[in-house]
Amino acid sequence: MNQLLQEKRDAEQFLRLIAPKYMGVYILNRSTDRFRDVLAPEAFRAYAKVSEGSYSDAMRLYRDEYVSCDYREVIDQVLDYDYVYNVLASGNQVDVSYRKKDGTLIRLKISRYSDSDENLSVWVYTN
């Protein structure tokens, strides 16, 4: 039990160290549109609460508030889960970038979570 607690503390410390580079890390189940956040800003967690746990609805709220108008199509494209699934099923990753209204460039990389569950994917946002 003590080792498990220490491993949890180590993981939390590691996340704190790398957090400035990572804007968010999510595990998404495309079949349910539900997600787990590994690392998320409080604003996104609030959107998730308002959207009752729907990742796509929370992302649309985020898009409308933060994403520059010229890049909203990028968000819409990745919210097409069939498109994302087809890219991942072909052995590739989805790798897109968009700008926030404040000019910050955000990179989103989407990968398969595992080979055993085709519905799960990892969404990593970096700046």
Task: Give the positions of each predicted feature.
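Conserved acidic
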Residues: 1, 126-127
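Interdomain signal-transducing alpha-helical coiled-coil linkers
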Residues: 1-12
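Generic recognition of flexible, low-complexity loop/linker segments
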Residues: 11-15, 25, 83-85, 95, ...
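PAS-family sensory domain signal
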Residues: 13-66, 112-114
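PAS/GAF/H-NOX family sensory domains and closely associated sensor/linker modules
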Residues: 55, 59-78, 83-88
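Extracellular Ig-like/FN3 beta-sandwich strand-entry sites
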Residues: 91-93
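PAS-family sensory domains
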Residues: 95-103
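Short loop/turn elements at sensory-signaling interfaces that couple input to output
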Residues: 108-126
